[in-house]
Design a protein with these regions (language model features):
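Glycine-rich anion-binding surface patch
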Residues: 1-137
Length: 137
């Protein structure tokens, strides 16, 4: 699947994967095991694990990864594809990511654009998603 097309539970799953969580799917809700840094913490369920709407979860990722997010009224990518009236996100230029692929992303909200950018910067422009996660999306 293209990272640029990931949404809903699929995008939440991918962000959780990048964050080191081991998500699994139960009746349409992404259930994540405890964060690897805090193995004794309880699992997080569904609505609490929504990087696409919860600034308290996504904000620290945006800050840590130095993602730039803004409203784009017009943008043409390297392939000549035009985008307009979408949120746009790109990674900040740091010594940590200087030799990594440069991934920009778009989305209908700032958090969706930022999380797509984050996933693309960690996993690439194409990702594999378990069938059970795709089926629940």
């Amino acid at each position: 699947m293209k990272t640029s097309e990931a949404e809903d539970q699929v995008l939440n799953y991918l962000v959780g994967k990048c964050e080191g969580r081991k998500p699994s799917c139960y009746t349409g809700i992404v259930r994540a095991t405890a964060h690897p840094d805090f193995p004794d913490s309880p699992p997080i369920f569904g609505p609490e694990l929504n990087y696409l709407t919860d600034w308290a979860l996504a904000g620290p990722i945006i800050e840590r990864e130095k993602l730039g997010v803004w409203w784009a009224t017009h943008y043409v990518d390297d392939d000549g594809v035009e985008y307009g009236n979408h949120w746009y996100a790109e990674p900040g230029c740091t010594d940590d990511n200087a030799d990594k692929p440069y991934s920009v992303a778009f989305g209908p909200t700032p958090l969706i654009a930022a999380m797509r950018c984050y996933v693309a910067s960690k996993l690439g422009d194409e990702v594999k998603v378990p069938k059970e996660i795709l089926d629940e999306n």
